């Protein structure tokens, strides 16, 4: 799947003038499994072997990553049985590290915005905390927003999420304005 995401970015790069895009201002955003994929997109490079398919003369690197409720370290245990099964069946023991964005972080990665609910029972918010710590350790610009009282879908089953969805949207817009200017 990451191969398809990387090919999509290369396609945007190759067709930027046709789509009226600035190829130097392409970012990626994903939620849950999409958060995992954009995190892997932001941390992987051509040496990982995932740049296959069309537009190989183009870069699959993005300039900013927004990952919401992402899985970042598959070596950790998950309370959700489906994620645990996917780790072993979908990736296999040998590929767990390779499929973990946290293992690919280098100092030349794009800026990251990580957003995670503190009541997420599907993907523990520690996944974003660990990724944030690794990014900071490697001097990658990173921002972590833990949404209080929010579950995996950023809703608040018991009260109000803080920051609110409107505030989260503004945080995202500010991040994009800063890094995709």
Q: What would you call each of these model-derived segments?
A:
Residues 1-25, 131-141, 147:
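Serine-hydrolase-like catalytic core of hydrolytic proteins
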Residues 4-7, 11, 36, 40, ...:
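Extracytoplasmic/secreted proteins, especially bacterial periplasmic and envelope-associated proteins
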Residues 7-80, 96:
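Primarily recognizes the serine-hydrolase "nucleophile elbow" in alpha/beta-hydrolase
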Residues 70-104, 110, 137:
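Mobile cap/lid helix-loop segments that gate and shape the active-site cleft of serine hydrolases
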Residues 73-74, 119-123:
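Acidic catalytic loop of the alpha/beta-hydrolase fold
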Residues 108, 113-116, 120:
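Short beta-strand/loop motif that positions the catalytic acidic residue
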Residues 129-181:
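C-terminal catalytic histidine-bearing segment of alpha/beta-hydrolase fold enzymes
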